[in-house]
Every structure is written in structure tokens, then in C-alpha cells.
């Protein structure tokens, strides 16, 4: 399951209540939700987890992760000042990256990943299809992704998008929430009030609705003759002829 969208804001969610993605989505109103990074047997996140400047977990590495600053936009950076969640960098600038992986992470497994397109849109990958890191990199590059982070996978892979979901019975301590930017409908052009002369002409039957719709259009000779004919008929009735 993949989706591409213009992201308005994102959030790192610390799931202390062991809620399901559906419960979290219902509480927050996010449009997309996916599982976060790795965790230990005590349900504690590993790597860096920072929420609004508060450090939940940390390690010795200063690698790229999902960084969310004051503008609320998720970016692949090393800045841990706002909110931050570790991930395994697998693509940067359109090139594959390789970090040392433990055997349980390196094996072929279901995958969750976040990617960025050159136009700034987000690409989310959340799928039960078993892939190696190399296969996931190839899939994402084929979709046009230029930066990407791999998150927890295997039995942790789970997410909900507007048009689909991937479920798991496993609860995870961190999740990533996204809000898709709403498409704004263009404001219709204001209706220009009729000029007094045109309004009078319409009331007298001298101007048709079609002519009023294009008040700046030049009048043809035929239309001019028709207008004069109607005007003459009105005068004849008024004068009692």
C-alpha cells in the first residue's frame, strides 16, 4: 500500500496507551498513520524519539530521521530540536544509502517507509509484501522518491490511509501521523452588478439575457436592427398606435 500526498503537518505519537492505529486516527483526525521505529521488549522506543523538544528516548547516533519543526512539516534531517523520530536512511538525493543492519532487520520482511518526492510531496509505503532493503530501495526509486527512511517492519508494519489499511495485532510505542493538505476550491468570480442602463434595457425588453452575459461584446448589425425593432414596437404601444 502506497500513497502520495501534499502534507500540511505531521506528528510523532508516543503510544503509551497501547492504542490501535484506528483509535489514534479517530482521536486525532489525521488522514494517514503508520507505525514508527524500533522498540524493545519493555515497549520502550529505541533510537531517538523527541516530541515537542521532550526527549523520550535517545542513542549515540546523530543520523538522519524524521524531523518536524515549528512549521509542522516532516523532513529528512538531523535536527532534533522540535519533534524527531529515528529511521534507517535508505535513500538520499536519489542515491541508495547503506547502514549496518542486524540480521532481524536485514531479512526479507514487510516494510514501512517514508519518502519525499522532488516536488515536496510525501510518499508513504506500508505493505505486508516481504522485501529486503535493496528491494525496497528499488521500489521507492521507481516511484520517483529522492529521500527515504525505513521504519520498523515485519509484524510491526501497520497503517491506515484514506483508501486502504494494513493491520497488525501488534501494538507499537511510536507512530507517525500525517494530515493531508486540503484542496481549496477556487473562489468563484464575483457577479458584476448590472449597469443601470443595461438593467433598464432588460426591463424594457431591449436587451436579452445572452447579451447581458457579455456586456462588453460588440453588437452586430443584426442585433442592432432587432433592438431598434423592439424599441419601435414599444413606442408604438406606448403612443397608442
Model features per residue range: what roles?
Residues 186-241:
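Short, solvent-exposed alpha-helical surface patches in non-cytosolic proteins
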Residues 1-185:
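Gly/Ser/Thr/Pro-rich low-complexity, intrinsically disordered segments
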